[in-house]
Amino acid sequence: MIRRQKNKKFELVSKFQPAGDQEQAIKKLTDGFEQGEKAQILEGATGTGKTFTMANVIAKLNKPTLVISHNKTLVGQLYGEFKEFFPKNAVDYFVSYYDYYQPEAYVPQSDTYIEKDSSINDEIDQLRHKTTSDLMSRNDVIVVASVSCIYGLGDPREYAASVVSISGGQEISRDVLLRDLVNIQYDRNDIDFQRGRFRVRGDVVEIFPAGYSDHAFRVEFFGDEIDRIVEVNSLTGEVIGEREQVSIFPATHFVTNEQIMQRALASIKDEMNIQVKKFEGEGKLLEAQRIKQRTTYDMEMMSEVGYTNGIENYSRHMEGRKAGQPPHTLLDFFPDDFLILIDESHATMPELKAMYNGDSARKQTLIDYGFRLPSALDNRPLKLEEFEKHVNQIMYVSATPGDYELNQTDHKVEQIIRPTGLLDPEIEVRPIKGQIDDLVGEINKRIDRNERVFVTTLTKKMAEDLTDYLKDLGIKVRYLHSDIKTLERLEIIRDLRLGKFDVLIGINLLREGIDVPEVSLVAILDADKEGFLRSTRPLVQTIGRAARNSNGKVIMYADSITDSMREAIDATERRRSLQMKFNKEHGITPKTIVKPIRDVISITKDSDEKENKESFADLNFDELTKKQKQTMIKTLTAQMQEAAKKLDFEEAANLRDAIMDLQKQVHEKKK
């Protein structure tokens, strides 16, 4: 069993001091929580330093903190910022580890069963393991998470009870340690040493913990006693330092043992028999035969190898929960007295609320047609009311708080003044006729000043067509769409800041928290098309993207001014007048935010090294002209031949694949 260290304190490191109206916001929020307020709202205009205010509140309250945001791009951005603010504390990243996920489903209309299919990102899985191990072992932890934190994660009590703790001088035989490691799902592999594995060389056992990316532990035995434990680089074997004691956390969050498995199998069999009788009684013989066959197969797999595809659907039985009882989630890994910060709460809270309903509808169809047992419904995200029961103290952070937050509390703190003196952007409404030509002219002005541009459209088709049109004009442009993978999204934002391209076009991905100070123009096409993406809150958020640059300007292309546009414009002008008044009183000249460009997610790669070592894999072939592609094919062919000479066949194969991809594109253009 492991004990959580409770004496660690958060240490905020920043060259900045609270400025503008940050100081009063920090004081009001901290005082409110210390006086017992359960919920508070920080209504902060874009660019006023809400993240810095959040960091100060965390440091002053000194409680384990969960920061939830509604999309992975923002989670990555916040994670990078909090790591800089708290370099001596544990800052963790927790999002869904699927790069690709096709949930199991059944479509009755066409009698189509869709098998679950997924692709797991190993780096994110490692970061998730680091999160839970940090929460179990220390109190100075900040976890930055997406809404996946309300999905099932296994029982934290079983997880903690399964931790293997070893120390120098401990009497334990090598074979007992190996058996303990196997029990917590570590694999022995003496050749391919990876996370969640161990290897044995005589009296030396090397363990690669699931939550580490490049460090392992070497345990040296003398007879039946641990002689020494050293931390080593998992790749080179270089000794990093000696350790008196280490805790090895399970390689899976869903810890089980023989006793739990046998109890679960008996419970699953009972439920299967009840469901078979129910279907037979209703005359649904196909469904009865289907559920019996599928469940029996799963039970045999679980009995023989301890696992089956879709084992998460039996989580209620594995954890011994009652029907309808909520699953264990990341929130259960926190101590009772913890703090929750909801970033961009107007978007995050509706998403938290929607998770359960969407999951439930899909699973009910699988149950009705005999593909899953009714207990599959209990492998689910938390309902909103279940999430609320976990809340000790919570702070909602947004430039435009939603109705839910406003109904939860009347303790609202406003933060309008930016430390840099920056004003809310000027807003201009221009007619739709000739909007593209007008936009091109505005883009070229920004390119001449080495500034960046955001363009938000209403449809995917328009975004794609506009991207192609601007490319043909020689403008460096990218289109940020929903199919782009998590870490690639962050790279695109980073490349925009670095100036690898000048214009980013999107639909709904540009609104909340995409923090690019270099952006001086935000163009909103079809601003008068009233609807979800052109209502007041989204418009205010979109306007805010230009508020981090002293030349910030927003152009709305519209033939009329809707109520939503009027509200957004009025709110912006109100803040702008307050900011101008503050600047005048204090003699402040607005200046663009200077923000370092960093490799947002990776905790293992050096961002500068990545910057210098440009790889062909980072290139977007779609942006190249036909002539550039042909030149690139020649260059890559030479590199491939060079790699083959050096016997670096993996690099040669990667280059070959890139060449084939380019040749295919050139060939298609000829057609």
Swiss-Prot record:
This is UvrABC system protein B. Residues 435-601 form the Helicase C-terminal domain. Its main location: cytoplasm. The beta-hairpin motif is involved in DNA binding. The UvrABC repair system catalyzes the recognition and processing of DNA lesions. A damage recognition complex composed of 2 UvrA and 2 UvrB subunits scans DNA for abnormalities. Upon binding of the UvrA(2)B(2) complex to a putative damaged site, the DNA wraps around one UvrB monomer. DNA wrap is dependent on ATP binding by UvrB and probably causes local melting of the DNA helix, facilitating insertion of UvrB beta-hairpin between the DNA strands. Then UvrB probes one DNA strand for the presence of a lesion. The gene is uvrB. The lineage of its organism: Bacteria, Bacillati, Bacillota, Bacilli, Lactobacillales. Residues 31-188 form the Helicase ATP-binding domain. Forms a heterotetramer with UvrA during the search for lesions. Interacts with UvrC in an incision complex. It comes from Lactobacillus gasseri (strain ATCC 33323 / DSM 20243 / BCRC 14619 / CIP 102991 / JCM 1131 / KCTC 3163 / NCIMB 11718 / NCTC 13722 / AM63). Residues 630-665 form the UVR domain. SUPFAM superfamilies: C-terminal UvrC-binding domain of UvrB, P-loop containing nucleoside triphosphate hydrolases. The keyword ATP-binding applies. ATP binds at G44, A45, T46, G47, T48, G49, K50, T51. InterPro entries: Helicase/UvrB_N, Helicase_ATP-bd, Helicase_C-like, P-loop_NTPase, UVR_dom, UVR_dom_sf, UvrB, UvrB_inter. Pfam families: Helicase_C, ResIII, UVR, UvrB, UvrB_inter.
